[in-house]
Amino acid sequence: ADIGMNIAGPAYNFGYNTGDAGGHSRVESGTAGAAAGSYSYIDANGDRRTVHYTAGPDGFKASGDIGVDRRTAAAAAALAALAPKAPVAAAPVAPVAPVVPGAWGYWGAPHVYSAVYPGLAGYAAHW
């Protein structure tokens, strides 16, 4: 199959408009690796947002209503101001304790006397 054989093929034009029912529209035209167009929609506040764009060797560039609208940004800022603030916590401080060295063992004579292993004494006697 020759899928995608003519991606940058001849010029094209297309568009659609859903009318008042959906509030969406789009128009695009392009040729040989470049495209230009626009789309629009009705946002949650009931405002029509329109974005114009171009795409080509320089990449994708959009202009128009590409950010958050002012009413939504203002409402979000008002809600953020009402949010409870976290209390400032003091930095944890490690308790200061004296350094006590561990007990050192005495590695001298054994606590219990034991005779030398007789086999070793007998072996040494044969030299």
UniProtKB/Swiss-Prot annotation:
A single GO molecular function term of this UniProt record: structural constituent of chitin-based larval cuticle
Cross-referenced Pfam families: Chitin_bind_4
> Where do the TM regions start and end?
none
Q: Residue limits of the Chitin-binding type R&R domain?
A: 9-87
Hydrolase recorded as keyword: no
Record keywords, A-Z: Cuticle
Record-level GO cellular component terms: chitin-based extracellular matrix
* Function comment: Component of the rigid cuticle of the spider.
Protein name per its UniProtKB record:
Adult-specific rigid cuticular protein 12.6
